[in-house]
Each structure stands twice: as structure tokens, then as C-alpha cells.
Amino acid sequence: MPLDCTDYREIFLNDRPMMDTRAPIEFTKGAFPGVLNLPLMTDQERQRVGTCYKQQGQQAAIVLGHQLVSGAIKEQRIQAWADFARAHPDGLLYCFRGGLRSQIVQQWLREAGIDYPRVGGGYKAMRTFLLDTTEQALQQCDFVLLGGMTGTGKTQVLGQLDNALDLEGHANHRGSSFGRRATGQPSNIDFENRLAVDLLKKRERGVQSFVLEDENRMIGSCALPLPLYQSMQGLPMVWLEDSLANRVQRILDDYVVNLCAEFVAVHGEQGFALFAERLLESLNKIHKRLGGERHQRLFLLMEAALAEQARSGDVERHRAWIEGLLGEYYDPMYAFQRESKGARIEFSGEHGAVLDYLRQRSPR
């Protein structure tokens, strides 16, 4: 019989395949990168067993569980677990605490002729390990923030650095009111877990100094871990600069051309209409901060640009609202932020200079 695995570091460093035997509702709240949910019980079955446990105790709940998962249902679930185990002989299974549910799955697999290891301590122990991983990195490593006006290409700079943490990538969101992607965001727990695994793997490769973008606490619906966000308030900063023309072009590419293509790839014929709706919604989100007259003017420019794009495929008219939004909203806001964080800025420059500086920078 295989021993339980409690080497959580090895599990995440090597991307060990795992099947999560918790109910779907638990899995949706938070899991780990690349894990497959193959539950012992459905949400409804779990709820009934939980109610029975509260009213009649553990033994009655176990009996009910075996009644609910029996016959053809039991055989189908064993087959799914067996298929996973055969496809991933180096894999593992787990439940919430490494308790009864994973023991039952392991036992039923054994009866089907397959010995398969469990994660000792289950989801809870692995989650604690990853939270500790982030805390330890904050205490032991060097961090620097990358700031800059909207559209300067901070994400592209991060993508060229081996020691970057792509917070927006892990959150699947570009970080602004216009940052939502065609695909949804992970749960907050999933976001935190992805970040922790990224930190773990980079530290294993010898990285001890990290670059990350200067972000608000919320990246869309994902909240930065509080210890990370708090530490970011005092970190040194590098400020990325670029011309207005380059910034407008980059925003046009990212938030119009590429985002539209994303929506079409995901939603097919409805893609453009959904993209247009999302763009207008994003502008409406900052209606109060823009003020009524300015919002209305930019809204009409955006509507006209979308109509032209729908008619001819030409995206050039989008430049008008992009330039207006930068000049009248984002740039003044970022100029204020730069002034307030000025004492923390240790270097500023355009792409090449910033890349060179960050690659050569010694930990502080």
C-alpha cells in the first residue's frame, strides 16, 4: 500500500497530478493549479450526509453516504478515479483534511486493483503550506515595484524578466476598470495559490529578488494577499515611461484588437457584440469619477468607434476615446500617484533602460 505523501514542496515543484475528491462546491471555492475534481459525493449528497452527521452522528452519516454512492453511481465514480490513476501513475488524491473521504476513495480503488497514494492532511495542509510560502518569501526575499502611466507596457516588461511575478496574469485581469478578459477570473483562493506556486518555483531556481507591478489591492475580483499588499506600500519602485503615441497604440492593441479577438474566439458569432457591451460597461464603471459631461462625450466617441469597427473592421476611431481617457482621467491620476510615491522611485526610463536596470539591479 502506498504511503501518504506529505512533501507538499515536492508536489508543487513537480506539478504532481492530483484528483480532488471534495464536492464541486468546495472545489469551486478554491483548489490548486492543474487539479481535476473527481468527487466522492455531489453537492447534494454531501449536504444530506452533513445534515445526517449533525442530527444522528458519524456512523449514521457513513451509512447514508454508502447508500447514496452505491450501485451504478459507485461504479461510474470508481471508473473515473481508475482512469485518472492509470493516466497519472505519479499522481495523488486528496480530500479536505486527508480524512474519511480520501480513505474511502483509496479503499475502493484498492478493491479495483489500484494502489494510489493520498496527500496527508489533504487540501487544508497544502493550502496552509502555500500561504506560508508567500509569507516566507515576503520575509526572506527582495521585491521592487514596476510603476508607470497606463499603456506604458508594464506587462510586456515583466514578460521579459525571469524574476517577475505577473499578478495580473495570475488574476486573468489587466488591473484597470477596462481589465476584464473574455474568460473569467479564478477564485481568490485559486489566485493566491497560483501566486504561491509561482514564488515557490522561482525560489527553487535561485531567484531571491522579484519584480512585480504596482497594483491596487483588488485586481478585478481578486484581492492581493494582505501581507503582500501591505509590504508593497513601502517597496522601492522603478517607473516606466513611454510616449503618448506608443501608449495609445498599445491600448488600442490590447483593449480593442486583442480583446475583441479574444471574445470572438470564446463566444463565436456573438463575440463582437459581447466585446462592445463589455467596453461600454467598463466606461460606465467610472462614470462618477469622469463626471457626466466628460463621460457622455467619451461614451459617444466609443459608440461611434464600435459602430465603425462593426461595419468595416477599422479600429482607428477608437484612438479618439483612448486619447481622451488618458489625457483627462488616467494621466492626471497617475501623475498624482507618481508625485506621492516619488521618494520611493529609484529609477525611471523607457523600456530598454528599465529592462537593463532591473536585470542588473542588486537586492536592497
Curated annotation (Swiss-Prot):
EC annotation from Swiss-Prot or TrEMBL = 2.9.1.3
GO BP, sorted A to Z: tRNA wobble uridine modification
> What SUPFAM superfamilies does the annotation carry?
Rhodanese/Cell cycle control phosphatase
- Residues of the active site: 95
Can you state which reaction this protein catalyses?
5-methylaminomethyl-2-thiouridine(34) in tRNA + selenophosphate + (2E)-geranyl diphosphate + H2O + H(+) = 5-methylaminomethyl-2-selenouridine(34) in tRNA + (2E)-thiogeraniol + phosphate + diphosphate; 5-methylaminomethyl-2-thiouridine(34) in tRNA + (2E)-geranyl diphosphate = 5-methylaminomethyl-S-(2E)-geranyl-thiouridine(34) in tRNA + diphosphate; 5-methylaminomethyl-S-(2E)-geranyl-thiouridine(34) in tRNA + selenophosphate + H(+) = 5-methylaminomethyl-2-(Se-phospho)selenouridine(34) in tRNA + (2E)-thiogeraniol; 5-methylaminomethyl-2-(Se-phospho)selenouridine(34) in tRNA + H2O = 5-methylaminomethyl-2-selenouridine(34) in tRNA + phosphate
Gene Ontology MF terms: transferase activity, transferring alkyl or aryl (other than methyl) groups; tRNA 2-selenouridine synthase activity
What CDD domains has UniProt attached to this entry? Answer: RHOD_YbbB
Tell me where in this chain the Rhodanese domain is found.
Answer: 12-135
Annotated keywords: Selenium, Transferase
User: Cross-referenced InterPro entries, in alphabetical order?
Assistant: Rhodanese-like_dom, Rhodanese-like_dom_sf, SelU
Role: Involved in the post-transcriptional modification of the uridine at the wobble position (U34) of tRNA(Lys), tRNA(Glu) and tRNA(Gln). Catalyzes the conversion of 2-thiouridine (S2U-RNA) to 2-selenouridine (Se2U-RNA). Acts in a two-step process involving geranylation of 2-thiouridine (S2U) to S-geranyl-2-thiouridine (geS2U) and subsequent selenation of the latter derivative to 2-selenouridine (Se2U) in the tRNA chain.
What the entry lists under HAMAP family is as follows: tRNA_sel_U_synth (MF_01622)
Similarity comment: family membership:
Belongs to the SelU family.
Q: State whether it acts alone or in a complex, and with which partners, per the record.
A: Monomer.
The cross-references to PANTHER family, in alphabetical order and at most eight, read: TRNA 2-SELENOURIDINE SYNTHASE
Q: What is this protein called?
A: tRNA 2-selenouridine synthase
Q: Which organism is it from?
A: Pseudomonas fluorescens (strain ATCC BAA-477 / NRRL B-23932 / Pf-5)
* Gene (name only): selU
